[in-house]
Amino acid sequence: MSNLWNSFEVYNKKKHSSQPGMRGGNHSNVGDTRTTVQYASERYERRGSTASESSTTSNEETPQMVDISKLSQNEFKRLYESTRKGEPNNRVNF
């Protein structure tokens, strides 16, 4: 009869590891008992790379804020297609 009530226990010791180093509750440092904190002075800026430079140039091609009421139909269509580029097709066919 005791086996039936074991499944309703809040903390079942048999479900968890017996190794004390593997108890990582509310932090991602599973092997450590404390959460590591990184202060703002310890943060380093990223180095310039070709990948980050190419992403900044691609952002310059498409304007971020555009007044849609002042665009012609062709300009709006070109802008609309450029923003949807690479977006998955989520159509559902019945």
Swiss-Prot record:
Positions of region (Disordered): 13-73
Segments of skewed composition (Low complexity): 49-62
Family matches, as InterPro entries: Spg4 (IPR020485)
Biased composition (Polar residues): 26-39
Function: Stationary phase-essential protein not required for growth on nonfermentable carbon sources.
Family: Belongs to the SPG4 family.
Protein name (record): Stationary phase protein 4
Source organism (scientific name): Zygosaccharomyces rouxii (strain ATCC 2623 / CBS 732 / NBRC 1130 / NCYC 568 / NRRL Y-229)
